[in-house]
A protein has these predicted regions:
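Conserved catalytic motifs of ABC-family nucleotide-binding domains
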Residues: 12
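Catalytic Walker B motif of ABC-type/P-loop ATPase nucleotide-binding domains
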Residues: 16-20
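C-terminal coupling/interaction segments
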Residues: 104-146
Length: 146
């Protein structure tokens, strides 16, 4: 894959379309490849369309996250909005029953507690101080949507 990307970059493209470009690479090589991608997009007229199952790569290099599941568009959002605002509320049934459902995206019941994906974790932390509110990763957000 490294050779293919080097060959593509040699043609001075404005757009790279990459499918699983970092899969199969060891963590050090993957990190170096992501640095190459970041350097490439520093030029204003350069973009990369990157398809990847490695969500940590997306968190490092993406500006926008588009999630497609079973051929259907699930969401397309600014990555910073997802990482900076979305959160997971962990709570019991008493707090769960009082949650403002307009702020929730999805939830999972786990034994005696709920995990709820919310659009605004700061608002949730303020409104429900007895709940545990934590940042949501891109992977967690995707898993809640399916």
């Amino acid at each position: 894959m490294k050779l293919a990307i080097a060959a593509a970059l040699a043609h001075h493209p404005e757009l790279l379309i990459l499918d699983e470009a970092t899969s199969g690479l060891d963590p050090i090589m993957r990190d170096e490849m992501l640095d190459v991608f970041l350097e490439f997009v520093q030029e204003e007229n350069h973009s990369i369309l990157l398809s990847s199952h490695i969500t940590s790569d997306l968190e490092k290099v993406a500006d926008y996250i588009t999630f497609i599941h079973k051929g259907k568009l699930v969401f397309s959002h600014d990555k910073d909005d997802l990482v900076d605002n979305y959160g997971i509320v962990s709570c019991g049934s008493v707090i769960f029953d009082t949650l403002d459902k307009t702020d929730t995206i999805a939830y999972r019941k786990e034994a005696d507690k709920y995990k709820v994906l919310v659009r605004n974790r700061n608002k949730a932390a303020k409104n429900y101080p007895k709940a545990i509110v934590s940042p949501a990763t891109i992977e967690e957000i995707m898993l809640f949507y399916v």
